[in-house]
Swiss-Prot record:
Gene Ontology biological process terms, A to Z: adherens junction maintenance; atrioventricular valve morphogenesis; canonical Wnt signaling pathway; cell adhesion; cell-cell adhesion; desmosome maintenance; heart development; Kupffer's vesicle development
Function description: Common junctional plaque protein. Required for Kupffer's vesicle lumen fluid retention and expansion during embryogenesis via maintenance of cell-cell adhesion junction integrity. Plays an important role in cell-cell adhesion via maintenance of desmosome and adherens junctions in the heart and is thereby required for heart and vasculature development, potentially via regulation of the Wnt signaling pathway.
Protein encoded by which gene: jupa
Higher taxonomy: Eukaryota, Metazoa, Chordata, Craniata, Vertebrata
Designated name of the protein: Junction plakoglobin a
UniProt ARM repeat ranges: 121-160, 161-204, 205-244, 247-286, 287-330, 331-370, 372-409, 412-453, 459-499, 501-539, 562-601, 603-649
GO molecular function: alpha-catenin binding; cadherin binding; nuclear receptor binding; protein phosphatase binding; transcription coactivator activity
Gene3D superfamilies for this protein: Leucine-rich Repeat Variant
Organism name: Danio rerio
Length: 729
């Protein structure tokens, strides 16, 4: 009795609702669609009658037959459903490939009729859904899981049609009921149906807003842990649509721990599913440092690199490369990507047919390369990069030269590999073709500077620059309008080229000496201008003291050549070199003492050095803790004292012996060798200056890219000498 008095079972309620609303099948119960597919064009134009074309030798009889059947033909063409089945209609169509005028006129009427029928059915769908919404909402909130399941199936069918879908998304109560049902049910079929409903609604902006307002995002994020693949697909696709088009969705997904659930999905094997997942990661991490760190903490770099290494589905590779590009500007993610083999995995896709994938990989490699200077196994990548130097695309050249510059910095193996791969010739041709493109020229010159020093093939590289007619082009880069970062790189390269005796004459013939002296004088004047040191230190990110040091160091090496020594001294440079001995920077003191050491080999220059009062600062420098400074100072003092009276020479000898050589008698002989070897400080590995130039400490020497540019690429990104972190792009 209590059972009869209580609430009816769920199945009974569904049956009662069906009977109260519909006397006939509405299409919901059976799943029949309201509008039949008319893909084959037969629904409204199928001919259940036969056209016959009769040929006779009597024209009058033919004309009579056609006149009698004219109305019948028009009616059959315009309203084919009015013709009785089995009727025979005479046709005037002679050529089956050409329509008659009546047939042509009938087409618009049939199209209009079809449109009217579709419109009627559309309106029927909308009205049906509108009437059903209140009751369906109630059923979705029912405690009986069977009722909820049946209601979810019905709503899922309704959301597959545009009219009913629009009606449903305009009901906040309905959408909220779907979200609650998805969260609360333990039935997988109900979960799949409700996830499908939200997926269908997410194709319109109104649906996205309804899902967002109803708290659908946290529910969808929880569905990312579902064991059912179809639920996973519906959830990730719906979230993807929300991230793309719904304002506030990104923050909501982050707050719901969406990233923590998405990153493990990278282990799935469906390429299309992975493409959507990686695009979600890109949308969430772009411009958000916290999201990048969450991806790192959940093993994202390893999963992303594995995708680049394993799959060949272009869209997946492209979306994955976009995520890596965003992560590659994060100082924490950068080494993780490199350690996971990211450089090699990205390098695999530099020779494919997809231009957008290649560009993404190049930008990412460019961002990562300063953290990969110690990586092994770069041979294939380096060869590909050298090959890309022949490209005409400015973005490819910018990236390829930048990566080569970083990977050859303080890495003997990479320097040798690039040199043996004809990298020097390719870089010179790149410089010649780049003209005024300074964002290409600077890294190309930096790469050449690295290749021409401190590795077994350095002398080969120095000779290759000359043999491929690179010296005149390189010296020209000292002129304006090239920016200071380019000038600084060129000065360092000239110094390295001068280490090869065969390059001394070509450098002199290219007017390298007067250009270096002019540049040195200008930089020294700029460095001495009144004002705070912070204000005068940098121009385009380059300290003028670094230019002073670089020019003096280059002149030091060029002064090894007797003819060059005379040219340098004749340009009234000795007073400036003596003045540089008072510099507060040890690097400047060292190169100044070094060039004076070479110039002092000529008697006339030695007399000028002494007359300029160099003895006092040189005596002071004998006590320097920098071995190079002390050694050069001793050599200059010894050479300038050779023509002095015996008492002076004795005093100098005693001072030198006491201050510099009391612990190493043999060093005295080394101090006055005819040619002093340049002393390389630790900071001069592949550059010069307090921080070294070539290492690209925390990023490459390039301006940040426009943060709004996610997929497009632009060229005008001038380098400067400051190591900096990239913004997202």
């Amino acid at each position: 009795m209590e059972m009869h008095m209580g609430e009816a079972p769920g199945s009974v309620k569904v049956t009662e609702w069906q009977q109260s609303y519909y006397g006939t099948d509405s299409g919901i119960h059976s799943g029949a669609t309201t509008v039949r597919s008319d893909d084959d064009g037969t629904e409204y134009s199928s001919k259940k009658f036969t056209y016959t074309t009769t040929f006779t030798e009597n024209p009058a009889e033919v004309e009579s037959q056609l006149n009698m059947t004219r109305a019948q033909r028009v009616r059959a063409a315009m309203f084919p459903e009015t013709v009785m089945e089995g009727s025979v209609i005479h046709s005037t169509q002679i050529d089956p490939s050409q329509q008659t005028n009546v047939q042509k006129l009938a087409e618009p009427s049939q199209q209009l009729k079809a449109a009217i029928v579709h419109l009627i059915n559309y309106q029927d769908d909308a009205e049906l859904a509108t009437r059903a919404i209140p009751e369906l909402t109630k059923l979705l909130n029912d405690e009986d899981q069977l009722v909820v399941n049946k209601a979810a199936m019905i709503v899922n069918q309704l959301t597959r049609k545009e009219a009913s879908r629009r009606a449903l998304m305009q009901s906040p109560q309905m959408v909220a009921a779907v979200v609650r049902a998805m969260q609360n049910t333990t039935d997988m079929e109900t979960t799949r149906a409700t996830a499908s409903i939200l997926h269908n609604l997410s194709h319109q902006r109104e649906g996205l807003l309804a899902i967002f307002k109803s708290g659908g995002i946290p529910a969808l994020v929880r569905m990312l842990s579902s064991p059912m693949d179809s639920v996973l697909f519906y959830a990730i696709t719906t979230l993807h649509n929300l991230l793309l088009h719904q304002e506030g969705a990104k923050m909501a997904v982050r707050l719901a721990d969406g990233l923590q659930r998405m990153v493990p999905l990278l282990k799935k094997s469906n390429p299309k599913f992975l493409a959507i997942t990686t695009d979600c990661l890109q949308l969430l991490s772009y411009g958000n440092q916290e999201s990048k760190l969450i991806i790192l903490a959940n093993g994202g770099p390893e999963g992303l690199v594995n995708i680049m290494r394993t799959y060949n589905y272009e869209k997946l590779l492209w979306t994955t490369s976009r995520v890596l590009k965003v992560l590659s500007v994060c100082p924490s993610n950068k080494p993780a990507i490199v350690d996971a083999g990211g450089m090699q995995a990205l390098g695999k896709h530099l020779s494919g047919s997809s231009q957008r994938l290649m560009q993404n990989c190049l930008w990412t490699l460019r961002n990562l390369s300063d953290a990969a200077t110690k990586q092994d196994g770069m041979e294939n990548l380096l060869q590909v990069l050298v090959g890309l130097l022949s490209a005409d695309d400015i973005n490819m050249l910018t990236c390829a030269t930048g990566v080569l510059s970083n990977l050859t910095c303080n890495n003997t193996r990479n320097k040798t590999q690039v040199t043996q791969s004809n990298g020097v010739e390719a870089l010179i041709h790149t410089i010649l073709r780049a003209s005024s493109k300074q964002d290409v020229i600077e890294p190309a010159v930096c790469a050449l500077r690295h290749l021409t020093s401190r590795h077994p093939e350095a002398e080969t590289a120095q000779n290759a620059v000359r043999m491929h007619y690179g010296i005149p082009a390189i010296v020209k880069l000292l002129n304006q309008p090239y920016h200071w970062p380019v000038v600084k790189a060129v000065v360092g390269l000239i110094r390295n080229l001068a280490l090869c005796p065969a390059n001394q004459a070509p450098l002199r013939d290219a007017d390298a000496i007067p250009k270096l002296v002019t540049l040195l004088s200008k930089a020294h004047q700029d460095a001495q201008k009144p004002g705070s040191s912070a204000q005068r230190s940098y121009q385009d990110g380059v300290r003028m003291e670094e230019i002073v040091e670089g020019c003096t160091g280059a002149l030091h090496i060029m002064a090894r050549d007797p003819m060059n020594r005379g040219t340098i001294a004749s340009m009234d440079t000795i007073p400036l070199f003596v003045q540089l001995l008072y510099s507060p920077l040890d690097n400047v003191k060292r190169v100044a003492a070094g060039v004076l050491c070479e110039l002092a080999l000529d008697k006339q220059s030695a007399e000028i050095i002494d007359a300029e009062g160099a003895s006092a600062p040189l005596m002071e420098l004998l006590h320097s803790s920098n071995e190079g400074i002390a050694t050069y100072a001793a050599a200059v003092l010894y050479r300038t004292a050779e023509d002095k009276n015996p008492d002076y020479k004795k005093r100098v000898s005693v001072e030198l012996t006491h201050s510099l050589f009391k612990h190493d008698p043999e060093a005295w002989e080394m101090a006055h060798n005819t040619v002093m070897d340049p002393v390389l400080g630790d900071e001069e590995l592949d550059g010069y200056g307090p921080a070294g130039y070539g290492g690209y400490a925390d990023g490459m020497h390039m301006d940040p890219l426009d943060p709004e540019m996610q997929d497009d690429f632009r060229s005008g990104m001038p380098y400067n000498s400051m190591a900096r972190v990239y913004h997202d792009y």
